[in-house]
Amino acid sequence: MNVLIIGKGGREHTLAWKAAQSSLVENVFAAPGNDGMAASAQLVNIEESDHAGLVSFAKQNQVGLTIVGPEVPLIEGLVDEFEKAGLHVFGPSKAAAIIEGSKQFAKDLMKKYDIPTAEYETFTSFDEAKAYVQEKGAPIVIKADGLAAGKGVTVAMTEEEAIACLHDFLEDEKFGDASASVVIEEYLSGEEFSLMAFVKGEKVYPMVIAQDHKRAFDGDKGPNTGGMGAYSPVPQISEETVRHAVETIVKPAAKAMVQEGRSFTGVLYAGLMLTENGSKVIEFNARFGDPETQVVLPRMESDLVQVLLDLLDDKEVDLRWKDTAAVSVVLASEGYPESYAKGTPIGSLAAETEQVVVFHAGTKAEGGEFVTNGGRVANVTAFDETFEAARDRVYKAVDEIFKPGLFFRKDIGARALKAAQK
């Protein structure tokens, strides 16, 4: 069978790498992919926004399964177009992807169906939003309602910071229509974790959890990013906590979507905070997390393609996991997530052993080596029997391949290390 992966980042490289290991698969195509994933997939020069081009390619190349990586094509209805053409595709419809496409929709859904989340209000008026912030005080969280590539959330530690953010979003329209409406919610403190599940309708098959690192710099400082690293398992989150989150959050959310006439097929990603009052939802995403996928899929023992086909065909899904640890560190371009240069030479990025894989995100091949072509450049991922060993291994590999013009966080997994030492 031929498989098509849509997207071009580190998550898509991981999906292609995992799909290529399947005994069911003859060819893996990636559209548009990136130069660094050429060992796992044949690159197809079609942008993820070219829906007609993608459908036509899938038909002409006997693609038996398409996996959509990024959120934008999902929210723009790419899955609906594949289904209309009679093609097997894994991902939510446009109607279901709204759970990520609109923060307000997701919050209202949780309120209606009693799914635990932070208290919130939604605003389109700067003056009303400002008055609310002054009434509530800081710390407080402000989110653009629509998509902003993981950069539409501000955790404001002071009222001044909150009001400046509201000004950016509502007055200066920093993200255009995406920030014309904002959700302001209470600040939650605790231990964060990402719980992804394969979902079809009310059927929910949870994956192992991961922890992501959103802030740009060590010690959780600096602006929010798409994610600077991740690890799995998360020793400070108990199995009981995860089970409880599946029963009280993920399953009810899947059921709620069915009841709303927006039945969800795909990966439902719950970004959760374990607070003193149990797990609460920070956000829902309608796809595989990035960089969480880079540590979760390497721990999957099952054949990913078989899992997705069985799920789509309403068969029993055989989901098994390895009892190993994975740690991934993002190499990013200096200046990310603000402005950064492209075209910086970064060598071969070769650190591949059986226990280290480099998943490429923003890279381009030029003259036999790679140059930077994005904010997040690559995910260096290591696996080992224990978390500590995987973490040591990943940082050794990062030191080997690091080049000027890049930066990375040196404290990925520090919280888990602390928990393991207790």
UniProtKB/Swiss-Prot annotation:
Cofactor: Mg(2+); Mn(2+)
Limits of the ATP-grasp domain: 107-313
A GO BP entry: purine nucleobase biosynthetic process
Classification via Pfam families: GARS_A (PF01071), GARS_C (PF02843), GARS_N (PF02844)
Pathway it works in: Purine metabolism; IMP biosynthesis via de novo pathway; N(1)-(5-phospho-D-ribosyl)glycinamide from 5-phospho-alpha-D-ribose 1-diphosphate: step 2/2
Binding site for ATP: 133-194
Enzyme Commission code(s) on record: 6.3.4.13
Comment on bound cofactor: Binds 1 Mg(2+) or Mn(2+) ion per subunit.
Signal sequence bounds: none
Catalysis performed (reactions): 5-phospho-beta-D-ribosylamine + glycine + ATP = N(1)-(5-phospho-beta-D-ribosyl)glycinamide + ADP + phosphate + H(+)
InterPro entries tied to this protein: ATP-grasp, ATP_grasp_subdomain_1, PreATP-grasp_dom_sf, PRibGlycinamid_synth_ATP-grasp, PRibGlycinamide_synth, PRibGlycinamide_synth_C-dom, PRibGlycinamide_synth_C_sf, PRibGlycinamide_synth_CS
Record keywords: ATP-binding, Ligase, Magnesium, Manganese, Metal-binding, Nucleotide-binding, Purine biosynthesis
GO molecular function: ATP binding; metal ion binding; phosphoribosylamine-glycine ligase activity
Residues holding Mg(2+): E283, N285
Family assignment from sequence similarity: Belongs to the GARS family.
HAMAP family: GARS
Protein name: Phosphoribosylamine--glycine ligase
Record organism: Bacillus subtilis (strain 168)
